[in-house]
């Protein structure tokens, strides 16, 4: 058996309602910086650390890496779903971004690209598939993966036996994701065999099962 730990990044400036930045450049908020420092004390010692290409995962992992002298390794397949192009949201706060996000999901087209630099849902699902089929077997037991909320929700969706290929699949996933609470700085345990991931569950803050 193998276990990995998925950590959603700490609160970002976007989570706190801030003005839009390019997705890869979004930093942590002041509250997120405190959450990251708390995680460094909570997580198990001396583990391999993997992050997405997004700044907020790097900043979340940084206190742990500094504490244990670990260098984070980048896994592009962990990148969050970036479905709104920066050109469409530049200068907007969270409230102003919301109707654009709702319109995207209501379209329910897995192959629709909203603009330059944006992902399609099919591409996003491909990243999660890459993680499940290629990356999982290669990762060492006990590794820490700092990632993102929608990504973790799609992983949970796929592990439950659901598909993410059609417009109906996409709409059903959105309803599932909207009802699944994945808090900033929460830690999730991903269990499976050496060949395949099987189950994902959230650990309580006082978990002693690392």
Name each model-derived stretch:
Residues 63, 154, 158:
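Active-site signature of alpha/beta-hydrolase-fold catalytic machinery across serine-
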Residues 1-5:
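Extreme N-terminal starter segment of soluble prokaryotic enzymes
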Residues 12, 151-152:
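Short active-site segment of divalent metal-dependent hydrolases/proteases
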Residues 7-74:
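Active-site-proximal alpha-helix that buttresses catalytic centers in soluble enzyme cores
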Residues 43-45, 135-141:
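Glycine-rich phosphate-binding loop signature in dinucleotide/nucleotide-binding domains
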Residues 27, 66-127, 179:
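Phosphate-handling substructures
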Residues 81-95, 157-210:
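Acidic, low-complexity terminal tails and accessory targeting/binding regions
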Residues 52-54, 77, 142-150, 157:
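Short, well-ordered beta-to-alpha junction loops that form the rim of enzyme active sites
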């Amino acid at each position: 058996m193998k276990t990995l730990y998925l950590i959603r990044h700490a609160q970002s400036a976007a989570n706190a309602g801030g003005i839009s930045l390019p997705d890869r450049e979004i930093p942590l908020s002041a509250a997120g910086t405190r959450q990251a420092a708390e995680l460094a004390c909570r997580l198990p010692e001396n583990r391999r650390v993997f992050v997405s290409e997004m700044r907020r995962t790097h900043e979340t992992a940084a206190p742990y890496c500094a504490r244990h002298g670990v260098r984070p390794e980048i896994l592009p397949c962990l990148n969050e779903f970036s479905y709104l192009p920066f050109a469409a949201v530049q200068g907007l706060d969270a409230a102003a971004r919301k109707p654009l996000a709702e319109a995207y999901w209501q379209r329910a087209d897995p192959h629709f690209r909203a603009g330059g630099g944006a992902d399609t849902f099919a591409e996003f699902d491909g990243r999660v598939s890459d993680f499940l089929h290629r990356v999982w077997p290669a990762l060492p037991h006990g590794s820490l993966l700092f990632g993102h909320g929608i990504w973790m929700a799609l992983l949970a969706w796929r592990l439950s036996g659901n598909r993410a290929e059609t417009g109906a699949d996409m709409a059903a996933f959105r309803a599932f994701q909207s009802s699944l609470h994945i808090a900033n700085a929460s830690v999730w345990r991903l269990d499976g065999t050496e060949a395949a991931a099987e189950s994902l569950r959230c650990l309580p803050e006082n978990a002693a099962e690392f």
